[in-house]
Amino acid sequence: MINVETSIIINRPIEEVFAFLTDARNSPQWDSGLVDIQQTPQSPVGVGTRITEVRKFLGRKMETTSEVVEYEPSTKYTRKGGGPFPITGSLTFEPTTEGTRVIWTFKMQPGGFFALAEPLVTRSLRRQLEAGLGDVKDLLESRAGAATS
């Protein structure tokens, strides 16, 4: 079982960060591994919303379909799904004096090639999650700076 957790503080209000990260239509702006994404229904997002992603990971294209199983506005967003293997991804949002702490937890039970290369998969996944959250931070904070200038 692979279990990766990373976090970041984004200097923006929790409602803004939550809304941005839970709308799959925003994902291509910050998720470099994403090839295609479809969300049904497109809005409003909530428990039962389904997301189908095609992504490139470790040189392979994978399609996964997940479903939102937990949706607590400005607090928690969790998706569970499958594809080549079971996955669970959770975003937890906490207010801080600087803005919002986002904690991203990702669990998966790899099979086949990915099971054999579990340490490599774990390192690569951690880098991808950290880079994604860093891109969200840069995007939201620069957008806010542009609005105030």
Give the residues covered by each predicted segment.
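Short, cysteine-centered beta-strand-loop-beta hairpins and adjacent loop/turn segments enriched
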Residues: K56-M62, P110-F113
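Beta-strand/loop substructures that line and gate deep hydrophobic ligand-binding cavities in soluble
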Residues: K80-A131, D138, T148-S149
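Hydrophobic ligand-binding cavity/cleft-lining segments
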Residues: M1-T40, G46, D135-D138, T148-S149
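Short beta-strand segments that buttress and anchor functional surface loops
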Residues: R50-K56, K76-G82
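Hydrophobic pocket/interface hotspot
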Residues: E16-L21, S27, I51, V68, ...
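Hydrophobic/aromatic beta-strand elements that line small-molecule binding cavities or substrate pockets
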Residues: T6-I8, Q39, T64-V69, T88-P95, ...
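A short, structured loop/turn motif at beta-sheet edges
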Residues: I14-E15, Q42-V45, V69-S74, T92-R101
